[in-house]
């Protein structure tokens, strides 16, 4: 039994005894949905009351369709549809692309198809408020492609969002700006302000500067689309802040959350105050030691969900007090990574992928259960960047 499992089994009492009066003073209930059970038929350890199913397997037709699920499924999102919903998933391969699963109102898969093709290493991305998927190429001159989840309109490259080693993008619907991460050891955090809302063909791309107190300012890039001999975007503003391997990023309730894999951190940027804080850091987490932070999502209840690239192959909920608490663990896949967590519109189903599965072939899953039963924590914010 590892420390995370002990915490889940022991609940609030065990956590308070183990970690002292500070947690006792908070009155936190540090359990999630109870201890993880034995692996199910799909090799997934889930809390009691939850169940999983495999939706798609790399190299095989999906359900009753003729569409073959692609290599290395990665970042994903859910979109409402007139007759159900759609889950889209990137393919982190060369060639890459984006594929989609269409669901009927009862959750059955009724169609599968491509919405973007001919791209390279589509890693993560982000959904827009106007219903498109932004798919990011993780290559040195990577682009962002805007994709139609319905698969009707062709995917369109958006070079105005910069040419660099993209990882993910989050859209702030209030400030009408986009935030982007860069997957390099010296990657940057970027902000894009479109000239016209819902049009990403032109705008201003800026890079973040962070002062000693953790406050963020932004400086425009001189050349957002550098060529092979030009200064790369991350080096155009010498005073910009380097982040150690930018990964998933998401907007929620006026804040941006993003992960950095090189130091296993999750950052929180308050857009109202421009203050950057550390929400989670493996180095200071006394419980879970969440490792390999990657894709980030937010549940319908507002809980932060982080997928592990390696580590224990877990999806982990991160509290505002900086604790990482496991929701599920995939067994028997030590050379894979979890990716693409996203909830259906009802909040009862969670979709995600294992990029390489137990045999090198990717799998896309659904987990269904009483997500709304989660008891809220007494949470606090602390930790300066």
Residues of each region from the PLM?
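Sequence/structural signature of beta-propeller domains
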Residues: 6-19, 23-385
């Amino acid at each position: 039994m590892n420390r995370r499992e002990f915490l889940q089994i022991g609940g609030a009492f065990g956590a308070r005894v183990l970690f002292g009066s500070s947690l006792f003073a908070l009155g936190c209930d540090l359990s999630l949905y109870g201890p993880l059970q034995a692996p199910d038929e799909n090799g997934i350890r889930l809390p009691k009351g939850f169940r999983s199913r495999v939706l798609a397997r790399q190299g095989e037709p999906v359900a009753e369709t003729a569409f073959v699920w692609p290599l290395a499924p990665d970042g994903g999102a859910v979109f409402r549809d007139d007759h159900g919903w759609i889950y889209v998933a990137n393919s982190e391969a060369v060639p890459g692309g984006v594929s989609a699963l269409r669901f009927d109102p009862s959750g059955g898969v009724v169609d599968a198809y491509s919405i973007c093709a001919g791209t390279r290493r589509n890693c993560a991305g982000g959904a827009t408020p106007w219903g498109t998927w932004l798919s990011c190429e993780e290559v040195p001159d990577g682009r962002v492609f805007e994709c139609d989840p319905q698969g009707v309109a062709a995917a369109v490259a958006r070079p105005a969002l910069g040419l660099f080693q993209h990882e993910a993008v989050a859209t702030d619907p209030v400030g009408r700006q986009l935030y982007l991460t860069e997957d390099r050891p010296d990657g940057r955090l970027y902000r894009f302000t479109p000239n016209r809302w819902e049009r990403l063909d032109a705008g201003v791309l800026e890079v973040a500067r962070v002062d000693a107190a953790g406050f963020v300012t932004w400086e425009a890039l001189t050349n957002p689309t550098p060529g092979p001999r030009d200064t790369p975007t991350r080096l155009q503003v010498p005073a910009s802040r380097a982040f150690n391997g930018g990964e998933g990023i998401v907007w929620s309730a006026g804040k941006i959350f993003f992960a950095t894999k090189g130091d296993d951190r999750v950052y929180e940027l308050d857009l109202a105050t421009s203050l950057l804080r550390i929400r989670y850091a493996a180095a200071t987490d006394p419980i879970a030691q969440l490792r390999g932070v990657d894709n980030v999502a937010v549940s319908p209840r507002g809980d932060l969900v982080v997928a592990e690239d390696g580590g224990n192959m877990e999806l982990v909920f991160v509290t505002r007090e900086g604790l990482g608490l496991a929701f599920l663990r995939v067994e028997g896949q030590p050379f894979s990574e979890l990716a693409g967590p996203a909830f259906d519109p009802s909040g009862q189903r969670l979709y995600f992928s294992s990029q390489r599965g137990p045999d090198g072939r990717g799998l896309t899953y659904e987990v269904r259960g009483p997500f709304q039963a989660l008891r809220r924590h007494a949470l606090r914010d602390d930790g300066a960047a």
